């Protein structure tokens, strides 16, 4: 490919296979043997003949000139010089001609015996240590035993190891003629050492036989270890057998007889001044190999003693090892400066390796970079390009035009004119630029909006001008950012840039479908200022207040004549939508500024009559884009950009110290807080409260004081100048600043965190707050305290960026081959979507979650029976409104999680493309978009786990359940007892743990809502009662969990001893004594309460968890419904919550949390077993009698009680549930939804909106594989990981086939063969005719498998494409596996195609478009006419 530079000769290959190279194939590629270790002559600087840079082997150093100089110039092209043997050709052949070294003895390839899994070792069934003994010439190995016996006189077996002594003794004992026998004679004794012995052994392996033997072993082996050993070996054997289907791939090729020498230009030797040379490390490594090989040759010729030869062979093996992979060896070859040499493997690996440096990222021509400045007068699709830069970029186009116009004759003179910058050049450049956009890119390109196309405009100066609204997408600012410019050259590229990438088309953010080109900073401030309303007060009069105008034109005249103020409230006749939704003229109360703003708004959007903030602007732009078109929206954006800047300037909205108003109540509030703190410290000193409580209370006081002060300050600043205070306007409009920052300017800086020592303690809040604010100034101590936070913030940001970048890289890698490939995969599955709630508060409504998805079933309004949406129909905004209005709790929609497309994903399962708000098209690379959408906001996530101190992070607990809809209550599984109510009367107390309340619609009987009724709650309604919306159904104690007596009787304590298993604590508010269960030293003692019946028999026992408060005394008589125990709920556990980036990584990598919960796998009743080794045993028994036992650490809180009924998937102890458990118990669907929701939660806390779709695409990729449980008659192995599609395909192939059990007298059939029933019948009928024994067969057993959840790194490394996996991580391992199994890469993903230099199979590069012929309508008509003419004949 490299040699033929004509366009036509680029082979369009569509797959690449990899395999082991045979010595013959290496020789076939090679141009000659390198015999000498010399490189170039230090005096003449010419390559030495037969050396590592030899011209005869690799080609001439100068273009068309042989080494001795006999033939020069191009006319001798292709002649081989008779004197020096060099072919006369161009020098670039030295980049692709390969040489070789013939090794005197074979050498094992380090990849196949040093890396795990050890390929050669597994084939021979040898451990790595023993294999090393063979390869490094320490032991002889018996290849063929013959008649030899060992010292004990027992016959030797194949693969026995012998020391040299033993070997010589055996040779002495054997008869003389043994060595004259032929090698194939079974009586001959053969034993060898080193790689030459391995070649012999590997050649003798019959893979099919070995495979059969190992399969038998794996199926029938009793010992676990031997079984896994057999399966591991099987994997290597099967890989080699698989490879032989596509190409020849013999195991003995893992041993090398010939070493290839890579082209000299790829390992250059550069002369430096002063007669020294800089060389590539590879040359040193090759030299060592050649020197040792030549020395060994000489020693063998002079018949040196065996010991010396053996040492030399070992050294040769080591030198070849370090050539291929220098890092694997314990003693790597080092340079003089003690740096390990870079071997061939190192040049592939890592960021600087071949894959990532040269194949995935290349440097390109026709590019420029410069600093960016703002271009406020540009249109949405324009950018300013410096003249000189443009002249250089568009040079070839200008040259062409210069020659066409006849201004110059040659290219050379054209270049001169351009370099002189003659006026005619600018004239031509203006023309060339028309319709030829450029691409602008700002690093880091975190999502696809980091590269956009603009139409260039020539400007003076040297900086690129960028449109201010494009900044958000590029994440650019003008503090010295640089951007790169690229020039699309071909007509297709230009078209794509104009139609797909033009900045004015990229208004929406692909992550969530909301506009991204939203005015920010000055623009928002100007628009906010112009639409704000000001009333006349006694201090200032507003000119023209209350006037009425006929039209906007009239108003503009009045405003220009200074007859009316910008912020004056006026009336105007204008068009807007009435109740019926028609555009009509009406009189509106509004302000002058709003009328001016509405002049820019397209008429279809109605009249916008509100104060504009950043938030409202985003909604307005989204609305306008929906109602009108992209060009109109981009025009509107340009208009409001101008308005915003103009009025920000006219308003003079800067601020001074005077605008920062400190509330005069500040001092008194601080004094009051100090008094309270003193009171608390007094309480502490008197011993009424613990140190921890004191700390929490102090922090709470300061937190609330700070909050109160902030509110006051905000109020003052809001009331100042009618809200026209500059600082307040900046904050309120969302242009700049936050409430926090205003608080630090006007209130007090507040509490600061302690510096955190390395992970041990610290990180808490210092209880003395900073009382000053920035206007007053900080004292030296206060300043010192606050520096810590500032520095930590900067350090964190730097670390975070790298982490987020790496996460994005892994995400892209796992999902890069998800492309929309088909219209409909035809699946019948989907996911059920409900509104997202937190503490009964709706975080994300049902409508938001299903918008733009495809409905799985028909949706009908349960109350009116109205048909809302059909199966496979898109849920649009209108349909969402209907669904929200109806009492529908959940909707089933199609989802990427359940898509069954073989390759990529289908349109119906993906739904709407968020970047266009239309249904996605085939060819869209949704995987990469998903990865970018998740990775891009990664830098905004917090890096650390965050700490919730005291009540600062507390939300008041909810304590009641209210009916959400009116209807009929239906309660399942309810058990109640009469008990005491908190207010003293009696009440119904719930004692069942799984009571469920359903509210049904009176007329239709459709279930409207479904809730769990908590244990211990007081219930106010009966089954079947009619409830009103908002009626309280049950209440409970929000601070304590309780255990309630179900029986009347007498209390008996067991193992409840003061000072051992419980302590007496005094409640500081009431002074009452309470018994609190504590952890006892003696782990055997389990504190238990028994309830005794009439005859002192135990009716019921309750285990008491640590921290429980006893509410009854020993021997006390109790009635039913008595509260026996209160367990304080840990309100806002002050532990650290893993949040932010680490949590996202943990979920995507499917790691198990450090303290996992124990989860029940079945529905059943709980009972407690014994304590074993510090673990409490919990037994769950199902109704069918199935029993599962679980061990829970004693330190973990147990969440269930004796005799509780638990459902599968319920946690038995506290901690987070592992994804593995969810998968095993609730199945793949549940775990996928769990992962999506958990990751969303992290982003939601940071206020980042990302559509669920993107997470679903990635999570789907994590569940591509299944693990084979029982291979049946398939080719799979037990425990093997295979793709779901392959698994289904293999099973379908076998469907209905038969397996021969006994071949009878048939010659065609073998036992174990799989054939169709028809073939079996035919064969048997032949046998029947000949009166022979018939063949018997059984039905095929198909394979069974379990779904597997893989982390994104694992999933990327196991993609089908080895090129993609190798360029990701663990390059050598991936290539090593791929070569052994002779893998074929079908180039289906994006990455593989970038690497081999093809167009990516997405978008316009989809393979189905390749065969399309583009022509004009006339040509088509002519073709049809010709065709018809032919038909008539």
Swiss-Prot record:
Region described as Disordered: spans on this chain: 328-347
Catalyzed chemical reaction(s): RNA(n) + a ribonucleoside 5'-triphosphate = RNA(n+1) + diphosphate
Residues that coordinate or bind Zn(2+) 1: 66, 68, 81, 84
Entry's Gene Ontology molecular function annotations: DNA binding; DNA-directed RNA polymerase activity; magnesium ion binding; zinc ion binding
Alphabetical list of InterPro entries matching this protein: DNA-dir_RpoC_beta_prime, DNA-dir_RpoC_beta_prime_bact, RNA_pol_asu, RNA_pol_N, RNA_pol_Rpb1_1, RNA_pol_Rpb1_3, RNA_pol_Rpb1_3_sf, RNA_pol_Rpb1_4
Residues that coordinate or bind Zn(2+) 2: 825, 899, 906, 909
GO biological process: DNA-templated transcription
GO cellular component: DNA-directed RNA polymerase complex
Binding site residues for Mg(2+): 477, 479, 481
Its EC number(s): 2.7.7.6
Needed cofactors: Mg(2+); Zn(2+)
Keyword Nucleotidyltransferase belongs to the record: yes
Entry keyword set: DNA-directed RNA polymerase, Magnesium, Metal-binding, Nucleotidyltransferase, Transcription, Transferase, Zinc
Polar residues composition-biased segments: 329-346
Cofactor mode of binding and number, as noted: Binds 1 Mg(2+) ion per subunit.
Function: DNA-dependent RNA polymerase catalyzes the transcription of DNA into RNA using the four ribonucleoside triphosphates as substrates.
Subunit field text: The RNAP catalytic core consists of 2 alpha, 1 beta, 1 beta' and 1 omega subunit. When a sigma factor is associated with the core the holoenzyme is formed, which can initiate transcription.
Family stated for the protein in its record: Belongs to the RNA polymerase beta' chain family.
Name of the protein described by the UniProt record: DNA-directed RNA polymerase subunit beta'
Source organism (scientific name): Christiangramia forsetii (strain DSM 17595 / CGMCC 1.15422 / KT0803) (Gramella forsetii)
